[in-house]
């Protein structure tokens, strides 16, 4: 599959950008910093897909046709947290660590972002062998794959974006793990009860998730919420408390917060 890649100078902060992109249902993008310290936004348009409306008056710095393979060449294997290695090259053979083979594609979740790193850290800490796990807003599927490699008995990965679902399925196949991947708007297509729910999405979407997550959890279930910018942490915690979730642990990297909760 080929995409049109457009590069823009990032004019607004990351939180505002993510809100605008998610409001328009646009998920195929990347944020990076160049050698001069400028923050750049790269968006990837499939054939026939239109640019998010708020970008229409932004100046395009660069434009080219590209494929997912082009985006992976600059990514080298790295340790996302202790003993968990992300390998975009598919060349790492070591057996003393958990290795996740990853084709980032155009879905959020290469493992480089602090929200993903904190999510993996808490999966390592709270997931017990044999747990049933659901990853809500799975993106590349990285958290679901880690959960399975950590010993979960059943893992379901869901995302509302069809491209993310396809990328996640590809990554599951690369890692030879038994993870079910399907399209779902949060938990709308999810049935059953899970021991652990992990979700690395925006704070506003967590508010929607909290409306329904009790339906698929039990009194001892663990809920990991990541992707929360610190200025919106309070509203997520207040909503969680109203829905019967108590805070177990909190971690912050830069402006990003991850919360671990348990049913009260």
UniProtKB/Swiss-Prot annotation:
GO biological process, one term: methylation
Superkingdom in the source lineage: Bacteria
Cellular localisation: Cytoplasm
Reactions catalysed, as given in the entry: L-lysyl-[protein] + 3 S-adenosyl-L-methionine = N(6),N(6),N(6)-trimethyl-L-lysyl-[protein] + 3 S-adenosyl-L-homocysteine + 3 H(+)
Primary location group: cytoplasm
SUPFAM superfamilies: S-adenosyl-L-methionine-dependent methyltransferases
Keywords: Cytoplasm, Methyltransferase, S-adenosyl-L-methionine, Transferase
GO molecular function: protein-lysine N-methyltransferase activity
Gene Ontology terms: cellular component: cytoplasm
EC number: 2.1.1.-
Amino acids binding S-adenosyl-L-methionine: 116, 137, 159, 200
Function: Methylates ribosomal protein L11.
Record family assignment: Belongs to the methyltransferase superfamily. PrmA family.
Protein name: Ribosomal protein L11 methyltransferase
Organism: Thermotoga neapolitana
Primary gene name: prmA
